[in-house]
């Protein structure tokens, strides 16, 4: 009997990976290949990898709205899935491809909810009228999908709130994972030396894109309260909008004028370099105001680094408060934006949690060791692949 053919549909795939969804698809594809015939359909430049097809934006849509160009890629992608047993789409960028393939080829469509357009209303700044298109693509796909995989229980709740037409029985929780063989402590310092990070000084590290949801401006304000000897290391690039890019630039310049040790790396670093920075971090900070799961927290934990993170979305399912890190309380607007109701209090609480942990080296070490154990025991990719295959089987894949 031929193995099940699974077609994964995604905007991001190595080497063009910008966020957690791209990391997820990379490792899911790798592990699923042990269990199924996996084909990957992605955006961008041609890939050398067998079983991977990349799609460029249609030339006829050059200059059109960004969301419209995405939809053009999706239609080509749907055509490329002929012969599959099940299609599995990731993020709104590929949801239309999955939905169209379901209708065109009569195959089940599984969607993974990494984030939700209704909970990111600020994206209207990026996409203009295209935000209505991205929201339509996602809603249409979710409401018709044979199964929806939520990357956390928090995300499952959000899916059912955002899309009340979805049958709760079709929404399963399968967590994001971590490759704990790759994400493991690296005690070397060559990368730190090159980036200008002093391994002899404590460091607070942030890794992520510059978007409203990631909350970097709150961290930059909270960093004013850090002890003078603590470095602030930002592996942060790709601002979503010129406005947030300018805000972060201004806050960073203000901070640099008052303290030393502010290291900002705007370029996307290869994984092994990020791992070394995470390993040497005294604490890793995730100030997100919207985070369905926060795979970056897992990456830090796997590197034996204590975490300070916002108690929002799926983060409390990853970061065990008082065991692998400290959670920062937050009261948020109910409009889906995640905006703190009291931004000054959130900044003060973030600063307080960072300073509480920085003052306790024994606790930092204990949290780091416990974080590594938790990552290994609960978030392995082989288990996630098995659970995902079960979802495919349940819908007749």
Language-model features, listed with the residues they occupy:
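Nucleotide-sugar donor phosphate/pyrophosphate-binding loop at the beta->alpha transition
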Residues: 107-108, 118-140, 157
């Amino acid at each position: 009997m031929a193995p099940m053919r699974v077609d994964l549909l995604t905007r991001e795939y190595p080497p063009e990976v910008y966020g957690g969804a791209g990391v997820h698809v990379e490792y899911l594809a790798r592990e699923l290949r042990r269990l199924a015939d996996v084909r990957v359909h992605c955006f961008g430049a041609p890939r050398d990898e067998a079983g991977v097809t990349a799609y460029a934006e249609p030339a006829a849509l050059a200059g059109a709205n960004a969301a419209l160009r995405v939809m053009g890629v999706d239609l080509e992608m749907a055509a490329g899935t002929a012969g599959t047993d099940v299609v599995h789409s990731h993020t709104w960028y590929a949801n239309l491809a999955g939905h169209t393939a379901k209708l065109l080829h009569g195959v089940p469509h599984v969607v993974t909810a990494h984030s939700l357009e209704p909970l990111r209303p600020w994206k209207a700044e990026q996409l203009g009228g295209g935000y209505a298109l991205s929201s339509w693509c996602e809603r249409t796909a979710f409401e018709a999908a044979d199964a929806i995989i939520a990357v956390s229980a928090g995300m499952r709740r959000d899916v059912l709130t955002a899309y009340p037409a979805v049958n709760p029985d079709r929404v399963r929780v399968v967590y994001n994972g971590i490759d704990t063989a790759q994400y493991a402590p690296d005690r070397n310092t060559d990368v730190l030396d090159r980036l200008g990070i002093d391994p002899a000084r404590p460091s607070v590290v942030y890794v992520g894109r510059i978007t409203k949801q990631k909350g970097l401006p709150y961290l930059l304000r909270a960093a004013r309260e850090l002890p003078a000897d603590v470095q602030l290391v930002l592996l942060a690039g790709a601002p979503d909008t010129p406005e947030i890019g300018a805000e972060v630039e201004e806050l960073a310049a203000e901070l640099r004028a008052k303290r030393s040790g502010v290291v900002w790396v705007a370029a996307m670093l290869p994984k092994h370099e990020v791992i070394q920075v995470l390993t040497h971090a005294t604490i890793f900070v995730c100030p997100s105001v919207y985070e369905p799961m926060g795979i970056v927290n897992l990456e830090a934990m796997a590197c034996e680094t204590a975490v300070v993170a916002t108690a929002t979305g799926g983060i409390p399912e990853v970061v065990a408060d008082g065991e692998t890190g400290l959670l920062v309380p937050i009261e948020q607007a109910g409009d889906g934006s995640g905006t703190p109701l009291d931004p000054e209090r959130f900044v003060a609480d973030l600063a307080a949690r960072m300073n509480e942990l920085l003052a306790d080296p024994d606790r930092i070490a204990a949290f780091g060791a416990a974080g590594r154990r938790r990552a290994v025991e609960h978030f392995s990719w082989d288990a996630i692949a098995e659970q995902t295959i079960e979802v495919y089987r349940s819908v007749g894949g």
